[in-house]
Amino acid sequence: MVMDYLRYGMHPDVPYDASIGEEMSAEEVIELGVDVVFWQNTASETLAKQLNDAGIAAVNIAFTDYESMKKSISITADVLNTDYAREMASKFNAELDSTVKEISDITSTIKDEDKLRVLNLRNFETLRADGKNTVADTWLGICGAVNVVSEQNLEGNQYLTKEQIFEWNPDVIMSSATGDAAWAYEQSDLSTLAAVKNKTVYDNPAGIFYWNRYSTETILQLKWASKLFYPELFAEVNVEQEIKDYYKTFYGYKISDENIQQMLKVLTPVGWGE
């Protein structure tokens, strides 16, 4: 699926409204003449079996943490079966490993009592959050934060209640939805939450996909979030330059300074969809 508002012109040949939903049947996929289908959602298991039975390779690339993410990247490269794909997969996996080590070496010195307690939301509308055994739980831990959902021993995607959020009272709230931070600050019924009082509710950046979710842009999430949480420990990190380097290295794309700021503010790129 192509993000319908955050493509930043990286692949202008892809139609603005290009997307494939779960409603597609095996027959419709077969008619497209594809050789391989990559899938990751458990809701697609039946379709994947039907495609495999029809002679079309349906490859599961689901992942829940960085180790399984690296495996899915390598599997994708092997399926594409080109030297370039394998080179880029190896480069990405190495970059992820080095980023994790670099940040962990610093955050491992933070005392438990000094760690920020963070809630990572899809949005305030659904209050859908990430618990244990998720990519969000992985990057939060590496960045030296405590995932308040995991703290309750809750796994996977969770739909929370407002009462739970008040009970846990996180220091920081992250949301994947544009404008959620500004919205939260205007809600009188949320005003007693620590994150609202302290203005530490943040719209999480997004690019090709949401950085804080199941995205290879998690490399950027690690660098951005660690500096956001502990600016004094990561004062030397230049997030804007990291963004430039990342998209140039892994997408061959020279992103503009304007688009970097739009990305960091989770805004629709100028001219997108016109």
Labelled PLM ranges:
Residues 46-128, 149-150, 203-272:
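Extracytoplasmic substrate-binding proteins
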Residues 37-38, 172-176:
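Periplasmic-binding protein-like
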Residues 105, 158-164, 185-191:
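Alpha-helical scaffolding within the catalytic cores
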Residues 43-53, 176-191:
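A ligand-binding cleft/hinge motif common to bilobed small-molecule-binding domains
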Residues 129-156:
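Alpha-helical, coiled-coil/dimerization segments enriched in small aliphatic residues
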Residues 1-42, 148:
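A short, structured surface patch at a secondary-structure boundary
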Residues 24-33, 53-54, 159-169:
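Short helices/loops that flank or line small-molecule/ion binding pockets
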